[in-house]
Each structure stands twice: as C-alpha cells, then as structure tokens.
C-alpha cells in the first residue's frame, strides 16, 4: 500500500501479490520485480520455471537439482537462484518471528529435465516417450503429470491477468503461448483424471 495524495493506493507489488494464488504471492511479487518481469526468459524457460511450483513429490534418491544442467542454461539458472534466495528470505523471516502465514515455501526441480522434451514433442510417440521416462526415472505417473501441466497453465493464466493489470504486454504475449506449448496428447484443459 502507498499513500498517494492522501488516499491509499495499492502498489504494483500489491497488485502482483493479490493476483497470485498458485504459488507464494509475496515471493512472486518481489521476484518478478527483481528479474524484470521475466523479460529474459523464453516461453519454454517460463514453463520450466513454473514447473518448480507443481507440488510433485518424488523419492529423495531421484530428486533433481538445477545447477549447471543442459536443461537449465545460465539465464534460467540465474532466475532460479534469485527465486530461491527470495524464498529463503521470507521463510527465514517467518521462522525468526514465529509467524505462520500459511504461505508455501517449497519448490522442486524434478520436472525441469522433462519439460523441454514435452514442449518440443511433435507427435504421440514423442509425448508417450516423455511420459514413460517420467514414470521410469521419477515414478511420476500420467495423472500426476497432467495435474502438473494444468497447474503450469493456471500459473500462466494468473500471470496473464497480472501482466494486463500492470501493462507488461511483452510478458503477456509470451504467457499466452504456454497453453499451446503444453496442452497436447493426453493433456487438455478438460483433463481431470487419466
């Protein structure tokens, strides 16, 4: 909130914060402002980034990091570093002051190696191959992956509204490419359970 000419006005950070439900809105607002509203990320990089918020659970022995991997690249790695720093900052504040805001501070990197293959898959066989790899490598089944992709789409839709509110047209354009990139094969907006 800001006091402008004796009236209370919601700041840009506040607009972002209230527009985000699928991941931590406080973290999202600071992160988006710090990294210039994802201007350096491609649509594919945004999809990979959003996959970190999908609440996929895998066994500790198959968990994936993100540092220095071919599927991350320097730009995305920088963004994830910044995101992790901001997450840690707010989590530490909650712990220090014994707060329980109910906000989530958990992110994962287990889908990062598979998102590019999914996005670039052109046919049923390539999509099926990605699904088999997810099951074999991570014990992530089709239904879980469908839910994860739908969550990525929802995050994109939330950010579309935020981008419209704060007039970030270039971000809006790239966000609108997400559904076409991820909703294919067994995954559609109508997918509830496979």
Regions found by a protein language model. Give the residues of each.
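Long amphipathic alpha-helices with heptad-repeat character
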Residues: 76-97, 152
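Accessory beta->alpha helical hairpin/"wing" motif in late/C-terminal subdomains of nucleic-acid enzymes
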Residues: 3-37
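Detector for Asparagine
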Residues: 3-6, 24, 55, 74, ...
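Leucine-rich, amphipathic alpha-helical/linker segments
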Residues: 24-84
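Short, flexible/disordered secondary-structure transition segments
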Residues: 2-6, 61, 193
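Long low-complexity, intrinsically disordered regions
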Residues: 97-194
């Amino acid at each position: 909130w800001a006091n402008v000419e004796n009236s209370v006005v919601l700041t840009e950070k506040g607009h972002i914060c209230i527009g985000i439900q699928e991941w931590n809105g406080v973290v999202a607002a600071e992160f988006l402002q710090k990294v210039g509203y994802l201007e350096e990320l491609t649509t594919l990089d945004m999809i990979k980034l959003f996959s970190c918020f999908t609440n996929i659970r895998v066994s500790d022995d198959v968990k994936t990091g993100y540092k220095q991997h071919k599927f991350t690249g320097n730009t995305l790695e920088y963004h994830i570093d910044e995101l992790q720093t901001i997450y840690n900052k707010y989590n530490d504040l909650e712990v220090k002051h014994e707060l329980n805001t109910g906000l989530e501070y958990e992110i994962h990197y287990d889908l990062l190696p598979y998102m590019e293959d999914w996005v670039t898959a052109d046919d049923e066989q390539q999509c099926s191959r990605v699904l088999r790899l997810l099951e074999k490598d991570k014990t992530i089944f089709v239904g879980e992956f469908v839910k994860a992709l739908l969550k990525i789409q929802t995050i994109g839709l939330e950010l579309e509204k935020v981008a419209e509110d704060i007039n970030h047209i270039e971000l809006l354009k790239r966000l609108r490419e997400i559904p076409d990139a991820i909703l294919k094969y067994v995954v559609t907006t109508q997918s509830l359970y496979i």
